[in-house]
Swiss-Prot record:
This is Undecaprenyl phosphate transporter A. The chain crosses the membrane at residues 15-35, 47-67, 107-127, 135-155, 169-189. Belongs to the DedA family. Disruption phenotype: Deletion of the gene increases sensitivity to the amphomycin derivative MX2401, which binds UndP in the outer leaflet of the cytoplasmic membrane and prevents its recycling. Deletion of the gene sensitizes B.subtilis to reduced levels of UndP synthesis. The double mutant uptA-ykoX exhibits increased sensitivity to the amphomycin derivative MX2401, but has no discernible growth or morphological defects. It holds the Pfam family VTT_dom. GO terms for cellular component: plasma membrane. It is found in: Cell membrane. It comes from the Bacteria. The lineage of its organism: Bacteria, Bacillati, Bacillota, Bacilli, Bacillales. Keywords: Cell membrane, Cell wall biogenesis/degradation, Membrane, Transmembrane, Transmembrane helix, Transport. It comes from Bacillus subtilis (strain 168). GO terms for biological process: cell wall organization. Flippase that catalyzes the transport of undecaprenyl phosphate (UndP) across the cytoplasmic membrane, from the external side to the cytoplasmic side. Is involved in UndP recycling during peptidoglycan synthesis. It is a multi-pass membrane protein.
Amino acid sequence: MGSLISEILTWLTNMGYAGIAIGLMIEIIPSEIVLAYGGYMVSEGTIGFIGAIIAGVIGGTIAQIFIYWIGRYGGRPFLDKYGKYLLIKKHHIDMSENWFQKYGAGVVFSARFIPVVRHAISIPAGIARMPFLKFVVLTVLAIIPWSILFVYLGIQLGSQWDDVENIAGTYTTPIMILAVVVIALYFVIKKRTAIFKR
């Protein structure tokens, strides 16, 4: 774990629940690490499990709402020009746009569990002017299990919480596979529904 990340996490620790939310909002540190550290704080009795989950969901959702609004009001030209300053890469935007166009709004939920497009998927949702409430609901529903998983892992790892990156694949790979299956099923159902309506 880099010294800079450790310093930031130490600073966030002093803020308790707000620190977890802020850590996820600014996205300087991967959400998995912030949530795992939150789990470590739970294991130390500094904060409560439910509170850590709520803070994670609030912080993660606000971060995605911010990206959604950028997509909605800034559009692709703004992101092509300034996306690098927001740590959003052009090929990530391209991939998420393709997914959104192919699978529709449901991908906002399932893509949250897939690396690369997990954060970028909010951009095409904003550009397409997806209903805001629908976007928030799907985002929250996806962030809840993600937060629970990594806070739990942080609790189990205790003082070795920073090993979460090494073991996360054991848990996230099945989730990613399931997410891809969900996307495929959603697409098939949507296509068949369209055929029956003809």
